[in-house]
Amino acid sequence: MSQARGFDRTITVFSPEGRLYQVEYAFKAFNNAGITSVGVTGKNCACVISQKKVPDKLIDASTVKHVFPITKGIGCVMTGSIADARAQVSRARSEAAEFEYKNGYPMPCDVLAKRMANIAQVSTQRAAMRPLGVAMTLVAVDDEIGPSLFKLDPAGFYIGYKATSAGPKQTETINWLEKRFKKDGIPSNLTDTVETGIQALMSSLSTDFKSTELQIGVVEDDKPFRVLSVEEIEAHLQSIAEKD
């Protein structure tokens, strides 16, 4: 840590090894939250899934949220600091609303991802600012490119995926998804897409979930983004159990 001394106090200065320590700390911050999320695209749909942990029995579970709508057709899952997550979601909604007001049509998912990544990158080079300790995974079904899935990180990097994960178990989850996609290809419908995501989390975390321990957002062709109810999640869990 002696090598980091002096260079981890500001995000605008590279260390002699070419590292930005505050940006690296931001990556650790969203992993330290202990929540793993996953995003999966299907042939005409996409979904995002997050663990849902309620640390205290007195907390109202309905107020613990990791999945958020951005616009009618775009949603996201936020992994990491929930305070930073709400700030980034609020900014994304503002950017999308301003884009639609100026251009007369909804902001495409890839354009929103690029805009939010550019905003995040600015936080890595200016003084008196810090990177957000959160990873943002956006989903939509675009009129031109179809199902879209983009992940943004605290460094301002973004890229599109067929399926991806964020959080402490993202490596294990992504490895499972790679094997699944290589074997079975892209899920053919919404049910398969959602259950693929759930099974990926189950495998990487080595646990069976209750319906109250997951939060799932889905978007389909010509249908708005929505968050599944506890009953709908339970139906998917029952379907997975019957297959096993």
Swiss-Prot record:
One of the record's GO cellular component terms: cytosol
Pfam families: Proteasome (PF00227), Proteasome_A_N (PF10584)
Subcellular location per the Swiss-Prot or TrEMBL entry: Cytoplasm; Nucleus
Top-level taxon of origin: Eukaryota
A Gene Ontology BP annotation from the UniProt entry: proteasome-mediated ubiquitin-dependent protein catabolic process
PROSITE patterns attached to this UniProt entry: PROTEASOME_ALPHA_1, PROTEASOME_ALPHA_2
Signal sequence, renumbered to the chain: none
Main localization (coarse): cytoplasm
Alphabetical keyword list: Cytoplasm, Nucleus, Proteasome
Function: The proteasome is a multicatalytic proteinase complex which is characterized by its ability to cleave peptides with Arg, Phe, Tyr, Leu, and Glu adjacent to the leaving group at neutral or slightly basic pH. The proteasome has an ATP-dependent proteolytic activity.
Subunit structure: The 26S proteasome consists of a 20S proteasome core and two 19S regulatory subunits. The 20S proteasome core is composed of 28 subunits that are arranged in four stacked rings, resulting in a barrel-shaped structure. The two end rings are each formed by seven alpha subunits, and the two central rings are each formed by seven beta subunits. The catalytic chamber with the active sites is on the inside of the barrel.
Family stated for the protein in its record: Belongs to the peptidase T1A family.
PANTHER family: PROTEASOME SUBUNIT ALPHA/BETA (PTHR11599)
Name the UniProt record assigns to this protein: Probable proteasome subunit alpha type-1
